Amino acid sequence: MTLSWLSIFRLGLVQLCLGALVVLMTSTLNRVMVVELALPAVLPGLLVGLHYAIQITRPNWGFRSDTRGNRTRFVILGMAVLALGAFLATLGMVWMQTAYLAGLVLSVLAYTLIGLGVGASGTSLLALLATATDPRRRAAAATITWLMMIFGIAVTATVVGKALDPYSAERLLELVALVGALAVALTTAAIWGIERRHRSASPVPAEAPVPFRAGLAEVWAERRARHFTLFIFLSMTAYFMQELILEPYAGLSFGLTPGQSTQLSGAQNGGVFVGMLLVGIAATGLRIGSLRAWIMAGCLGSALSLLTLALIGQTPEGGALLLPATVALGLFNGMFAVAAIGSMMALAG
């Protein structure tokens, strides 16, 4: 039995929760550390980089959820660890004002937990989608879940940003705790029972689990999987490299205020949303182009958009092109992301 559209939407709520928590760590805390606390910009950059580096454990989380047969548990526990890490990261940032070393140590621990939580929850969720979704619905399923993640990012940033005005450390701690609690509760309610119904309707013979190293070696031996892995490594490095750079670049090169640069980031996420929606409709509904073609278009378009952003910063008249170039970058990022996820699920299936 494959997932219904309602079940796919429910799993998308988990992605929404992931986006809601992660954006607070990579955007809100980043700004507060650099602007309000006047800490070196390299510090939040390293902390955000740490949470991405920890996610190299994703293959192991996927393997564990596959072999132990309870992805729901990994999704819920991962979200709980992420929520705890988010609260501790906020607390560590507050401590840095009076006890810098203690706050830094707590922040390192917190961002480690954030990376583990995102890896466990996000990977197990995608594994469930890949194995339980009808092949004809995979591109649409990827689009729905990732659109909901972008939606969660946009809504959380907007609501929390308004609630934080005027800023206070106590208020930020309260908001992060509230978002974390809501994320864990919504994740539990959204995913509960989906995997059990799919497993009971599609029984498979029990097999002895393959050891992780043996399974990894088997996958790596497959030419398509190996090449796709290397491609994703390179492309996602480029995809996330601009995350902590775009807003400072807009301020330094074009004189945008923090509010204006935040709006620029929102415009980029709007482009990502449209790009994902475009590929979902075109690839699944209208049968236009293959996922491979959409991936290539997304990568080439992203490269050209990023090059344009770099070049317009060298000319006085370039400010007029900043917004359209940023939206275009988001559009092509979204096209690439959802097509790549769809291709990954096709390989897994």
Regions found by a protein language model. Give the residues of each.
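C-terminal ends and interior cores of transmembrane alpha-helices
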Residues: 79-101, 299-317
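Juxtamembrane intracellular "pre-TM" segments in multi-pass secondary transporters
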Residues: 1-5, 195-229, 253
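Pair of pore-lining "gating" transmembrane helices in MFS-fold secondary transporters
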Residues: 1-35, 112, 220-242
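Short amphipathic helix-loop junctions that connect adjacent transmembrane helices
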Residues: 27-43, 244-262
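C-terminal transmembrane helical hairpin of 12-TM major facilitator-type secondary transporters
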Residues: 292-340
